[in-house]
Design a protein with these regions (language model features):
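Short, contiguous acidic/charged loop-to-helix segments that flank catalytic cores in large enzymes
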Residues: 46-54, 96
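Catalytic cores of nuclease domains that cleave nucleic-acid phosphodiester backbones
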Residues: 1-46, 72-76
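Metal-dependent nuclease catalytic regions and adjoining charged, substrate-binding loops involved
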Residues: 64-152
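Well-ordered beta-strand positions in beta-sheet-rich domains
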Residues: 21-23, 56, 93
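Hydrophobic (often cysteine-bearing) scaffold residues that line and stabilize catalytic clefts
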Residues: 55-58, 104
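A generic fold-level signal
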Residues: 19-21, 54, 126
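Short amphipathic alpha-helical face segments that pack within enzyme cores
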Residues: 57-65
Length: 152
């Protein structure tokens, strides 16, 4: 039987040279199991594996923090799409894979290492529409980090 353990849970983990922090929307438990649920206010995407993968990484990062800091094994990762009218369409169960949880933690270690080493090379420029809305677009242009001419 699933029950709410806690809502809006601040989680953090002191790593080598930085603190990894996040906020879990909902911790569920029961029968010795622990589940992480994240609410999404949009409808469930019909064809966006990249978006689902990003949300899975988010939940795996939370699982990494809980497992490393508190020794709590996470059993399931859940997304709940609040704009879906039907409950069966709203709840999405993501597969729990301990390797993905470890990769999520490693991703932040690698990113922080690159930031600390001042490795800011942009390997794949974003779409022009993203740059158009970005507050840092003038810096990119002035520093030659991203040029729209290179994108085509």
């Amino acid at each position: 039987m699933r029950r709410v353990i806690q809502t809006e849970v601040d989680v953090s983990l002191e790593k080598d040279g930085y603190i990894l922090a996040g906020k879990v929307d909902l911790l569920l438990g029961g029968d010795g199991k622990l589940e992480l649920l994240d609410f999404k206010t949009s409808p469930r995407p019909k064809d966006s594996p990249e978006l689902i993968a990003a949300y899975e990484r988010q939940l795996c990062t939370y699982a990494h923090i809980l497992e490393r800091r508190h020794g709590r094994h996470v059993d399931r990762l859940l997304l709940y799409w609040t704009s879906e009218p039907l409950k069966e369409d709203a709840l999405m169960v993501l597969p729990y894979d301990p390797r993905r949880v470890e990769e999520a933690g490693q991703h932040f270690d690698d990113t922080v290492r690159r930031i600390q080493a001042q490795e800011f090379e942009v390997k794949t420029p974003p779409e022009a529409a993203i740059c158009k809305e970005c507050d840092l677009r003038m810096l990119c242009h002035a520093e030659g980090i991203i040029t729209r001419e290179a994108r085509g």
